[in-house]
């Protein structure tokens, strides 16, 4: 029996979710995990928290909505607050997870989290692209040749790229 863990971060939905699809393709059991980072409640160098009350309320409503939709499909959302790499690694070990999936992030803090998690995990971490309309591999040019002006980018992309259809919402989520 293969168990996967899907680490949710900025992708609190079930539709058009590439890491979820990859996890479903490779698992008999699935853990959906969201970790609310403690660091978000600390002040930045500018003296304000990374998350304000309005954003936190919206995030919690989004998580509740995700929990409801996961339960309707037989899944369960695990919610924790703390250090995400520590929590994900601990859950992966406790539940004997074979692989962890997540969306690839590009911001420096999130990249550090990914590196930290990789060091802690005893299983592979599979990061999937999918937070943008196009994957890097679908571009008609290399990133080195990325047009500096948006209209040039748009013209090349419109001419040469076929936009993928969204991934449908899974009908069933495996239990954990």
Where are these regions (language model features)?
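Substrate/cofactor-recognition hotspot
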Residues: 164-176
């Amino acid at each position: 029996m293969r168990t996967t863990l899907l680490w949710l971060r900025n992708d609190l939905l079930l539709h058009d979710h590439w890491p979820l699809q990859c996890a479903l393709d490779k698992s008999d059991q699935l853990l959906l995990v969201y970790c609310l980072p403690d660091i978000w409640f600390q002040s930045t160098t500018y003296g304000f928290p990374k998350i304000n009350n309005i954003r936190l309320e919206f995030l919690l409503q989004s998580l509740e909505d995700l929990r409801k939709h996961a339960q309707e499909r037989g899944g369960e959302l695990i919610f924790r607050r703390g250090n995400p790499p520590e929590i994900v690694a601990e859950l992966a070990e406790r539940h004997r997870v074979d692989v962890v999936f997540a969306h690839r992030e590009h911001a420096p803090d999130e990249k550090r989290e990914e590196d930290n998690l990789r060091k802690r995990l005893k299983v592979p971490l599979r990061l999937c692209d999918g937070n943008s309309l196009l994957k890097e591999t679908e571009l008609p040019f290399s990133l080195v040749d990325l047009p500096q002006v948006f209209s040039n980018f748009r013209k090349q992309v419109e001419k040469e790229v076929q936009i993928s259809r969204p991934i449908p919402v899974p009908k069933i989520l495996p239990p954990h």
